[in-house]
């Protein structure tokens, strides 16, 4: 069982998607995302399996939550630096987003 201390080790931040493209070399359908987390963290890259619910052009400008302190993960020829968070639903993964615009880099609290 996970503890509250385990949860507190995660650094979950808000970022804005600035680029989204089809990740043709991924084994499962995915997009390559660039997410801007503001001054402290800057722009990070992520591979996200969210193709069932979103088109790449719909993602630009959306704020999302992501874990920013996992080690980078090589996926095909792409280095994924953050884990964008979503919920599994019948129609595919749905992104977890703030319900109001907030500053990029804000921490989940």
Question: What residue spans do the PLM features occupy?
Answer:
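Phosphate-backbone binding interfaces of nucleic-acid-interacting proteins
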Residues: 1-109
């Amino acid at each position: 069982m996970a503890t509250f201390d385990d949860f507190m080790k995660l650094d979950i931040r808000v970022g804005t998607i600035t680029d989204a493209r089809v990740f043709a070399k991924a084994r499962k359908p995915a997009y390559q995302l660039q997410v801007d987390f503001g001054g402290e963290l800057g722009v990070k890259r992520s591979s996200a399996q969210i193709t069932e619910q979103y088109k790449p052009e719909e993602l630009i400008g959306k704020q999302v939550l992501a874990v920013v302190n996992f080690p980078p993960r090589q996926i095909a020829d792409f280095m994924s630096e953050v884990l964008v968070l979503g919920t599994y639903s019948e129609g595919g993964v749905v992104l977890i987003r703030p319900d109001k615009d907030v500053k990029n880099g804000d921490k989940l609290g």
